[in-house]
């Protein structure tokens, strides 16, 4: 599962 930091990076 993608981390919240990964989602924020987009």
Swiss-Prot record:
A GO cellular component annotation in the UniProt record: extracellular region
Subcellular localization: Secreted; Secreted, Cell wall
Domain of life from the UniProt record: Eukaryota
Keyword Coiled coil: no
Keywords: Cell wall, Disulfide bond, Secreted
Main localization of the protein described in the UniProt heading: secreted
Protein family per UniProt: Belongs to the thaumatin family.
Name assigned to this protein: Thaumatin-like protein 5
Lineage of the organism: Eukaryota, Viridiplantae, Streptophyta, Embryophyta, Tracheophyta
């Amino acid at each position: 599962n993608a981390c919240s930091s990964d989602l924020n990076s987009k």
